[in-house]
Amino acid sequence: MSEDSKCPVTGKTAKTAIPMTGRGTTNQDWWPNQLKLNILHQHSSKSNPMGGDFNYAEEFKKLDLAAVKQDLYAMMTDSREWWPADWGHYGGLLIRMAWHSAGTYRMGDGRGGAGSGSQRLAPLNSWPDNVNLDKARRLLWPIKQKYGRKISWADLMVLAGNCALESMGFKTFGFAGGREDAWEPEQDIYWGAEEEWLATSDKPKSRYSGDRDLENPLAAVQMGLIYVNPEGPDGNPDPVASGRDVRETFARMAMNDEETVALVAGGHTFGKCHGAGPATHVGPEPEAAPIEEQGLGWKSSFGSGKGGDTISSGIEGAWKPNPTKWDMGYLKVLFKYEWEKVKSPAGAWQWLAKDVDEEDMIVGAHDPSKKFRPMMTTADLSLRFDPIYEPIARRYLENPEEFADAFARAWFKLTHRDMGPRSRYLGSEVPAEELIWQDPVPAVDHELIDAADIADLKVKILASGLSIPQLVSTAWASASTFRGSDKRGGANGARIRLAPQKDWEVNQPAQLKTVLQTLEGIQQAFNGAQAGGKKVSLADLIVLGGCAAVEQAAGNAGHDVTVPFTPGRTDATSEQTDVASFSVLEPVADGFRNYQKAKFAVRAEELLVDRAQLLTLTAPEMTVLVGGMRVLNTNHGGTPHGVFTDRPETLTNDFFVNLLDMGTTWQPTAEDADIFEGCDRATGELKWTGTRIDLVFGSNSQLRAIAEVYGCADSGEKFVNDFVAVWSKIMNLDRFDLA
C-alpha cells in the first residue's frame, strides 16, 4: 500500500503522518537558561522494570555469594574467541572495568562512582576512557543472567574486580553489596562544559583557569577521562607536571598521596594497555554504533580488531613481567630502569625501559614467541619523579606487606566510597574494621526513649526559651548536610556540634552554640533522671526540637499535627570525624535558608535545585519546603527576604498567597540586582523583599504551577500535611537503619 493517499474531495495528495514524538526543537533549545527541574524527577518507577515491590537488599541476601565468586574465577581464564583474553586471563580487563566504574566519584558533590551501575548507560558507556569496557560487561552477562535480580550490575562489576585481583594472587580487604542499578542516565551530574571529547585546556569552555586550576566539582582533567591523561597534561609527556594532575584528581575523589601511590602501583601490577595501531581504525562508540552491533562499540578494522590487534587507550604494552600475578614487579621495574620517551604504534606518548634484562622482558599477550620491554605512561613515571610520591613508592618497594595492605585498603575505599554508612553494606565479606572515611557513628547501646518520653521532652524543649526559628534552623542545619549522591551527612551523629560544622557561617555559630547548650542541658537532666540506662542522644534531641517547633507552628495556624519522630540516632565523637572530609559538605548556598556565601556565576535558583536534588527532593517537595521555611522565619541571619507573611512562626501558605498576589509589583534593588522589592501596585508602598530563590516560584512556569496549588484558598491543610511529610523525610534521610 502506498503511504500517499488522495483526498476524495480535492484530489490532493496527503502524506501519512509519521510519529515524531520526542523530536523537534525543545524548550531547552528555545530557552537555554531555563531552570533544569528535570534533575528532580529522575529514576522514577516508569523507567524501572523491577516493579514497586522489588527490594534489592532482600534479594541480595538470598544470593550465594561464594557461588558467584566461583563462577567469576572460572570465567577469568575462559578466553572467548570474540574477545580473547590477554595471556589467557581477563583479570586486567575486569580490574579496569571496576576501577572506571568507581573512579568517576568526586567528593566535591558526592556524585559519580560505582553505586548505580551507570557505566552501562550513556554517557559513561561511550567515554573515550572506557574504550572496550563494553566487552568486559558482555563477558559478565552469562553470570548476571544466571543470578538475575539477586545481584545488580553495579555490585557485579565491583565484585568482578575483586575476584580478578583474588584470582591473580592478591588478598582483598573485603566486599560489600548493596548498590542498586540505575535504569536511565543520570542527568544531575556535571561532567564539564566542553563540547568535544578529550578537549585540551586551550579549547573553548575549558575546565581550567589560572595556573591550571581545575573547575569544581570536576575530578578529571579532560572530558571523557576518569582521572588524568596518561600521556601527561594535555598530552605533554612531563612526569613532574603529570604528578600535579594526579595529585589533584585523586585528592578530589578523596584519596591522599599514600592511597594514590598504592592504587596506581597496585592497579598497574596487572594487565596491559592497548594501542596496536592508529585510532583511525576504530569505529564509533556504543551510543553511535549501528544497531546491528547491539550495543557494542569501537569496532576496529586494524588486523583482527582484537587480541594482539586491540586498540583502546592508544598506549601499548604492559608494565611488568607476569601481568597476571600479584608481585612487586611494577615498583621494581619503575625504579630499576631508565626510561626513553617513544610513540606507541597508535601515536601516543609513552616510555620504554632501557637496556632491559632478559628476566624483565614481557611475553606477548597473544603470541608467546614475542617479547617486549616494560612500558610506563607519563602518569606512572610521576610516582618516580614527583618529590612527594617518590619516597612513598620507594617505601612500598622496600616493604611489600605494607604495600599490599595499602593497596587492599585503597581499592576497598575506591570501590565503596559512594555507598555511605556501613549500615548499607550487605554480604558475608563486609570487613569488621570500622574506617574513618565511612563516617562512623556509635552503635545504640542503651534503651531508647518511648512515646511518653518524647511527649515530655517536647514540652521541655518548647518551654526552654528557644524560639521556633532557632529550633527549626538547628534541626535543618543538622539534617540537611545529607547528600543522596554518596549517602554522606545527615543528623545522625550530631556532628553539627563538632568541627567543622559548628563553625560554618551558614549555621550561625553564635546562635547554634546557644541552642546546643540549651538542648544539652535538657539531655543531661533527662539522662541523669533515668534508671536502667535509658538515654536520649543529642542527635535525637536536635531533631525532636525541630519536630516540636513545626508542630507548634502548625498549631499556631489551627492545625493539630504530629510530626513523625523515631529515636535511634547516636552522637559521634571527634575521633570518628575527619574534619577535612566533612569540610566538603559545607553549603556554598542554601536556598532553603536564603543563604549564599558569595556571588557565583551560577544563578541562586540553580544552586537551590542542585541542593534539592542532593536532598532527593522532587519539585513539589522543594516548593512546599521553601514556602514553609520562609513563614517559619528561618532565614540565615534573620533577614526578612521571602518572609511573605504578617504572622511569622505560623505554618501557613502565606508565602504562596502573597507571592502570587497581582497587587504586588517587583523590581530589583539598586544595591543588589539579586534582591527584589515588592511594592503595592496601586500605592507604591513597600510590602516585601525577596531573593531570586523566592521569586523563582512565581517566575518559572513549572514552579508557579506548583505554587498555585499551595496558594489556593482550600490548600491550608494540604500545605501543612505536605510540609510535615517532607520535613520528616529530610530528618530521616540518613536513617538507613529504618529501611
Swiss-Prot record:
Keywords: Heme, Hydrogen peroxide, Iron, Metal-binding, Oxidoreductase, Peroxidase. Signal peptide: none annotated. It catalyses: H2O2 + AH2 = A + 2 H2O; 2 H2O2 = O2 + 2 H2O. Formation of the three residue Trp-Tyr-Met cross-link is important for the catalase, but not the peroxidase activity of the enzyme. Its cofactor is heme b. The keyword Heme applies. GO terms for molecular function: catalase activity; heme binding; metal ion binding. Its EC number is 1.11.1.21. It holds the Pfam family peroxidase. GO terms for biological process: cellular response to hydrogen peroxide; hydrogen peroxide catabolic process. There is a cross-link at Y227-M253 (Tryptophyl-tyrosyl-methioninium (Tyr-Met) (with W-99)). One of its GO terms (cellular component) is cytosol. The record marks R96 as: Transition state stabilizer. The active site is at H100. InterPro entries: Catalase_peroxidase, Haem_peroxidase, Haem_peroxidase_sf, Peroxidases_AS, Peroxidases_heam-ligand_BS. The keyword Metal-binding applies. Heme b binds at H268. There is a cross-link at W99-Y227 (Tryptophyl-tyrosyl-methioninium (Trp-Tyr) (with M-253)). Binds 1 heme b (iron(II)-protoporphyrin IX) group per dimer. It comes from the Bacteria. Bifunctional enzyme with both catalase and broad-spectrum peroxidase activity. Belongs to the peroxidase family. Peroxidase/catalase subfamily. HAMAP family: Catal_peroxid. PANTHER family: CATALASE-PEROXIDASE (PTHR30555:SF0), HYDROPEROXIDASE I, BIFUNCTIONAL CATALASE-PEROXIDASE (PTHR30555). Homodimer or homotetramer. This is Catalase-peroxidase. It comes from Syntrophotalea carbinolica (strain DSM 2380 / NBRC 103641 / GraBd1). The lineage of its organism: Bacteria, Pseudomonadati, Thermodesulfobacteriota, Desulfuromonadia, Desulfuromonadales. The gene is katG.
